[in-house]
């Protein structure tokens, strides 16, 4: 909301500021990523030391997966925030709906759907961040395969870059009749 001049006073100020839009978008994204990743790290510490969940020798890979997931989440939020017109409530509703759909298609709500999607619509498995994140964890703990893990992480970072680029291009081209 704060990047669109017609939706908030802060957005109006930002759109006329002499600061390059890419700088503003990157600063916002880094701030959101820092908070998101810190929350996930706190959760991992809680799981490891309070709940005593043993992550084995894969902790570095788990942290990398969490970082890639946070980057994808922030990028996806930026994409939706830039392209969806409406209030914060509308954007939140769209984000929740899309996240639930991606989670369902990744097999996180009904396990057989993951296999069905991978057989009937294979490309969907490669562009669904929820599927890539869950498959990264599966590849570490079920398959024990690092090449598959790194493919998932690479795809997550590529999707994130595409979403950030699309957000920036849309934001850069937006013009307002009056601010």
Write out the residue ranges for each language-model feature.
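Transmembrane helix boundary and interhelical loop/hinge segments in multi-pass membrane proteins
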Residues: 1-17
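Short juxtamembrane and helix-loop transition motifs at transmembrane-helix boundaries
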Residues: 20-29, 53-60, 83-85
């Amino acid at each position: 909301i704060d990047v669109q001049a017609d939706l908030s006073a802060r957005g109006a100020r930002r759109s006329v500021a002499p600061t390059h839009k890419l700088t503003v978008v990157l600063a916002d994204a880094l701030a959101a990523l820092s908070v998101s990743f810190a929350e996930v790290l706190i959760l991992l510490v809680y799981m490891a030391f309070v709940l005593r969940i043993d992550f084995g020798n894969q902790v570095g890979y788990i942290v990398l997966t969490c970082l890639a997931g946070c980057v994808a989440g922030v990028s996806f939020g930026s994409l939706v925030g830039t392209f969806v017109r409406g209030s914060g409530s509308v954007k939140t509703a769209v984000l929740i709906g899309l996240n639930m759909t991606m989670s369902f298609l990744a097999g996180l709500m009904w396990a057989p759907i993951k296999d069905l999607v991978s057989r009937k619509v294979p490309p969907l498995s490669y562009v669904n961040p929820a599927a890539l994140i869950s498959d990264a964890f599966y590849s570490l703990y079920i398959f024990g395969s690092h090449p598959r893990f790194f493919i998932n992480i690479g795809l997550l970072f590529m999707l994130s870059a595409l979403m950030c680029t699309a957000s920036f291009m849309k934001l850069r081209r937006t013009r307002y009749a009056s601010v």
